[in-house]
Curated annotation (Swiss-Prot):
UniProt similarity note: Belongs to the TrpA family.
PANTHER family: TRYPTOPHAN SYNTHASE ALPHA CHAIN, CHLOROPLASTIC (PTHR43406:SF1), TRYPTOPHAN SYNTHASE, ALPHA CHAIN (PTHR43406)
Gene source species: Methanopyrus kandleri (strain AV19 / DSM 6324 / JCM 9639 / NBRC 100938)
Pathway info: Amino-acid biosynthesis; L-tryptophan biosynthesis; L-tryptophan from chorismate: step 5/5
Keywords: Amino-acid biosynthesis, Aromatic amino acid biosynthesis, Lyase, Tryptophan biosynthesis
SUPFAM superfamilies: Ribulose-phoshate binding barrel
Name of the protein in question: Tryptophan synthase alpha chain
Assembly and oligomerization: Tetramer of two alpha and two beta chains.
Amino acid sequence: MSGLVLERIFEEAEGEGRGALIGYLTCGHPGLEETVSLARALRDGGVDILELGVPFSEPIADGPTIQKAVDEALRAGTTPWDCLEVAEEVSEFVPVVLLCYYNTLHANGFERYLSAAAEAGVSGIIVADMPVEESDEVHSVARDLEIDVIYLVAPSTTDERLKKIGERASGFVYVISRYGVTGARRDLSEDTLELVRWVRDHVDVPVAVGFGISERWHVEEVIAAGADGAIVGSAFIKEIHRSEDIAEAEERVRELAKELVEGARDGYRRRSSSE
């Protein structure tokens, strides 16, 4: 399921009167087969796009919850190539965006790994530690393979950098809702909502917000502020950690996804009524 499909997914969500929901899983946590079944549970709960994390030994952008999942996946021997096998299965029923680090791509060869990702049906890629100024090679290879490169916009992003991102962006832009690393939190600052509005005014592709989005009202607020989608990771991983077995984990993430989708619907309704 590739070929620049991500923007269409956002359009379909809007057509249903809601923002899109992007769910994150760490590949190989708690196992490769379990990752596929959890992805299916997320899809059944209403997740529109799966962000599949490729385990890396130094996940500098990840908070403690996801770092724990990454460590467990690495100890189990999960490789970047295993992740493509999982992506191939998952992309049969939900679009897949890979989340990886620059060293992973470099060590496996940009063209070699991205070509295999395209063959596996991967729709997009997020390189967590790759600024737009250093993205020429990855962007060129991915564009030729019809894989969207998803760029990150942080509170510290300058007007000049956002302009460059706007020129290159496809699929969607990932807005980092705060400084620091990923992780669930209870508050959502007005600065985040202003950041969403600022980015929305400067790019022509969908805008999705992540980092700390964990509750229904978080999703509602960012969609109401103008975001086209919300990205939820740590909250799903926590539900997996709380579970006694994979069946319970599937049920927990499915039910959480359903709740978050309702937040995306409420946020879209609020935004539409104020326009």
